[in-house]
Amino acid sequence: MKRTLDIGVLLSRSGMYAALAYASRLGVLQGVAEVNADHTLDVAFRVVERDPEGRLDRYAPLCREILRDSQARHIFGCITSASRKEVIPELERFGGVLWYPVPYEGFEASEHVAYMHACPNQHLIPLLDWALPSLGKRAYFVGSNYIWGWEMARIARERVAAAAGDVLGDRYIAVGDTDLDHIIQEIRALKPDFILNSLVGDSSYAFLARLAELKQEAGFQSGLTVLSCNFTECEVESAGSAAEGLVSAGPWFEPEGGSGGSFHEIARQSVHELAKLLHGRPGADVLPLSELVQSAAGSGHTPRLDPTNLHARQPAIIARLLNGRFQEIKRLPPLAADPYLTRQFGASHDGPLLKVVS
């Protein structure tokens, strides 16, 4: 006999990054359907959903509403780091947990967040370690003007400097902004070996379109490779052919040409992981996340999350978009998350060095 538990879903169905949220939402709903149909599990989930509509000011109130007005203590959602940080105080107030299924910039370890996707030692650093010897050492950074863009550029700048490279430019625009003339003009003048694109949603699609036009000019046909740690299959339709040749890093790419990418797949896996953590353990949904993970490990389940920092171990895959599909270039085996970059990438020690504190 299954027991039914409320879970929250806090993902935008509209707004400037709707394609990303759409893929994650479908992944969550698929995971719920699979868990509810799995008779080997004694839990089923009932979805309590709220739509922030891509507006940052709606995330915290809607998170509060889910936690206050339902029995849900676990919420799946948020796409941007700004929205994640908005809801953490509400999670702390009500004892909730956010299952965060998308890549982020690291330098965070909340007791109330399950970081299921990749952090920089699992995406950005492997990507740069491939790019610098393969493409050249003259880099240009462009990103959305919030913590994701800032931190990705900061970490990348340090990595480029360590390789004796140069950062030719480091520019930011507001999320959703598509006024890119000054950036395109600068790239035309500087001719970098590669561009790290940390733009989000509509801004990224507009940038790729403008860059595709620039590549038609003499002297650019064979250069201007774009790197990304947040572009997946779920954005290929929105970006169109302008994204061709983009090189992305992540823990999972569609093996047979699907359109959801890792945003869909990690969201789906996250629902399954929660179900396994709660299976056979009535009342465990109200436990602190680290305690839930540790106690499940003691019951025979091997958790996806490291109980010391609540980040998932993930492989690092580098792939290039060709003919609308990502083709793998390089794959590293699953890496323990190092959200604060407290150890050198590639060092022999691969165990956690941090402990989550509430």
Where does each model-flagged region fall?
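Extracellular/periplasmic periplasmic-binding protein-like sensory domains
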Residues: 211-282
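Periplasmic-binding protein-like
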Residues: 69-79, 99-101, 140-141, 191-207, ...
